[in-house]
Amino acid sequence: MTTQLEQAWELAKQRFAAVGIDVEEALRQLDRLPVSMHCWQGDDVAGFENPEGSLTGGIQSTGNYPGKARNATELRADLEQALRLIPGPKRLNLHAIYLESDTPVARDQIKPEHFKNWVEWAKANRLGLDFNPTCFSHPLSADGFTLSHPDAKIRQFWIDHCKASRRVSAYFGEQLGTPSVMNIWIPDGMKDITVDRLAPRQRLLEALDEVISEKFDPAHHIDAVESKLFGIGAESYTVGSNEFYMGYATSRQTALCLDAGHFHPTEVISDKISAAMLYVPRLLLHVSRPVRWDSDHVVLLDDETQAIASEIVRHNLFDRVHIGLDFFDASINRVAAWVIGTRNMKKALLRALLEPTDQLRQLEASGDYTVRLALLEEQKSLPWQAVWEMYCQRHDTPTGSQWLDSVRTYEKEILSKRS
């Protein structure tokens, strides 16, 4: 430990103690909050089923920065490089298209055995795993419908895919001793004016009920459902709207997924957390950064990321909120994207843990909004960075921007050699 870091740490402890905050306790609490990193940043959502296929479903990964992972070995190596540079507990979020098999596997036939390498790797790296059925980038999703498809055979294919995915998710939880959160997002919708908005939603309701009909131990598997406002090619109507999934999660008591980019640009998910928690048992968060639309830019340490973290901490939702990331930027170094976004999420959580929330709540209850605002602003100037650097030091990860040296070396020695 450097003398400079030690000095900054001691001063920070004193400054935060003066406002009633125990920084050691804050770091202990931070170690209770894993962040689930998304595997698809590493290869632009290509997967291993058909890596040369097109990304569909109304989502886009833009850019052509060299060095993207081309197979599972490369993707896991890239993830390991990122993991070494991020302090504290982490998880990995997988999509079904990241299966491994010597022969083609239909999506409705995926099995736990196709993900055994991921499980062994997760064990070696002390990670939990989360999962997602992949209801896009497939011939049977080409017309814009999956679980709400009017063709019963196609609809059943996607139902069976989601059911098979739940078995994979439960396998993750059994093997790793931590529940896998499996999130269902579908791209279903229409480009233009839609006459019958009810029938697709009725089909989706019935399909989801069939999907979740098999019971699993919640210690192994948790179901989540995710809404979206619109997608490219589905601008006018989205079957799985916010109202649909809020109703579904409430009535079926599944988890509800809130994606930061899946709402109108004037809406923020930080304001939805407390409302949803009154009705659903759990929330899954997809922290992202929408720029004018669901662009999935790399997460910043901005006001909304901080507000999301503050909602979790202020209301002690550690055991009911699952924090995941969802962005994919192909215009920058993909390992760096993981590191930047995940470290920013953890910084936001730390800053929230260093807030004198009880004092602020008392001021609010007494109607002293002047002091509430003043203290919230003064809080921003307290030396949280020194606490963060100590956290990095204790987890044997680089402080400040030192992690960039490791990424540059990895790019020169590994990524630059990929064609």
Curated annotation (Swiss-Prot):
One BP annotation, GO: L-lyxose metabolic process
Pathway of action: Carbohydrate degradation; L-rhamnose degradation; glycerone phosphate from L-rhamnose: step 1/3
Pfam families: RhaA
Cofactor comment text: Binds 1 Mn(2+) ion per subunit.
GO annotation, cellular component aspect: cytoplasm
Keyword Manganese part of the UniProt annotation: yes
Keywords: Cytoplasm, Isomerase, Manganese, Metal-binding, Rhamnose metabolism
Positions that bind Mn(2+): 262, 294, 296
Record Gene3D superfamilies: Divalent-metal-dependent TIM barrel enzymes
Main location: cytoplasm
Cysteine disulfide links: none
Cofactor (UniProt): Mn(2+)
First-level EC class: isomerase
A GO molecular function held by the record: L-rhamnose isomerase activity
Subcellular localization: Cytoplasm
Enzyme Commission identifier(s): 5.3.1.14
Catalytically driven reaction(s): L-rhamnopyranose = L-rhamnulose
Known role: Catalyzes the interconversion of L-rhamnose and L-rhamnulose.
Family of the protein in this entry: Belongs to the rhamnose isomerase family.
Family annotation (HAMAP family): RhaA
Subunit structure: Homotetramer.
Name used for this protein in its record: L-rhamnose isomerase
Protein's organism: Salmonella enteritidis PT4 (strain P125109)
